[in-house]
Amino acid sequence: TKENNSLYVVDLKTKSISGVYPLGGEGYTCALSPTKPELYVSCWGGGKLLVFNTMQKQFTDTIKVGSHPNDIEITANGNFLFVANANDNTVSVIDLNKKRVIEILNTALYRNSLYGSTLNSLALSTDQKTLYIANADNNSLSIYDVGKPGFSSSEGFIPTGWYPTSVAIVGNKILVANGKGFSSLANPYGPNPARKDGESIYQKSDTT
């Protein structure tokens, strides 16, 4: 839970809490390994991924990732994990056998873009070779060939509706939930296909 920065373990037979484990920061989501007795927890407020051994009932590893990690996607063989880092336009690729980041994917529209893509959802293709990344504030999906983790390559972008918040793969179809509607709004300055690579803009405001 985010409210008290803890992982709760619930006994489904007795419908009671069997353990509470501090995360050291706000948790976002968790996912079970398909092959190991491990649970992976993205620590939203800590810039880290925690590894919880479900047999030993304790955290066994902490893996440093990017800023504001949220959604998690694990390969079917349980060897690799992808975590979306909302605050710095990146996805951390983690080798779950070595428990370390082996690659960082940049999902911004331009190589030198300022932070602000706001990644918030991941989905792997059925063949496990393509990763789809929801860039909420870019109104797009970023696509990466991840067939060989550690040597991934960008495949480009797919335009979406306004503020994509979730992406899922069903067969050969990509389903995207648009949090604010169907039109790609509300950036008055773009996206602009003619903008030069690396050109960025910002707006000032007065909060007083």
Feature locations, PLM:
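Predominantly soluble domains enriched in secretory-pathway, periplasmic, or organellar proteins
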Residues: T1-T208
